[in-house]
């Protein structure tokens, strides 16, 4: 089946090919993609919006994706092992949904760090520590990076290539690389000085 790695490339490309061949229904393919990317979608939103809104906004992202996925055109993007059209679509949709929410809310009421620390109580010590450190790093990035750098940083951390990020944000790959380097430099400088 899909998850057995009989086909080459990322899971999403194998799912898209199986769906195009009629081996998977739209719902079965959606379920696999949801399991693969739900944490990434939530993490993208966690950096952008208050923690109380994440679940609702993630649901909005997935509803938008589901509607689009049922009409998905299975084209050349499935042939490249580097391209991940689903991840790119989810990234753009997260940006759109989060910005719409920000325009309505105009304020952040809680910090993702607090929520990560609350959830940390139930995990093993190493994963708890990694989760808290990641939440702190993302919170710092949100404070010190301009929005356009934060967009690139989040996409790169999720594993998107510079080409995918460039296409998603309608910028050049050189600009993606520049913004990514600038975001990392800001974070390093802030960490050296102390947050």
Predicted regions and their residues:
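A short, charge-rich alpha-helical start-of-domain segment used by transcription regulators
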Residues: 2-9, 20-46, 66
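Hydrophobic/aromatic residues within well-ordered alpha-helical segments
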Residues: 33-37, 41, 61, 90, ...
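Structural recognition of an alpha-helix C-terminal capping motif at a helix-to-coil junction
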Residues: 56-63, 67, 80-96
């Amino acid at each position: 089946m899909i998850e057995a790695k009989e086909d080459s490339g990322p899971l999403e490309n194998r799912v898209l090919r199986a769906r195009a061949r009629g081996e998977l229904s739209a719902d079965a393919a959606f379920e696999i993609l949801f399991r693969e990317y739900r944490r990434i979608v939530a993490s993208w939103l966690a950096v952008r919006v208050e923690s109380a809104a994440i679940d609702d906004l993630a649901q909005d992202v997935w509803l938008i994706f589901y509607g689009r996925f049922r009409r998905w055109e299975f084209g050349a993007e499935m042939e490249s092992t580097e391209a991940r059209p689903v991840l790119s679509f989810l990234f753009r949709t997260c940006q759109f949904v989060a910005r719409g929410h920000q325009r309505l809310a105009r304020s952040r009421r809680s910090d993702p760090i607090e929520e990560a620390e609350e959830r940390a109580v139930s995990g093993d010590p190493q994963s708890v520590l990694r989760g808290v450190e990641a939440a702190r790093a993302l919170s710092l990035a949100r404070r010190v990076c301009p929005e356009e750098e934060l967009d690139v940083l989040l996409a790169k951390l999720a594993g998107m290539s510079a080409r995918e990020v460039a296409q998603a944000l309608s910028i050049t790959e050189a600009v993606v690389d520049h913004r990514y380097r600038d975001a990392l430099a800001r974070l390093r400088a802030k960490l050296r000085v102390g947050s």
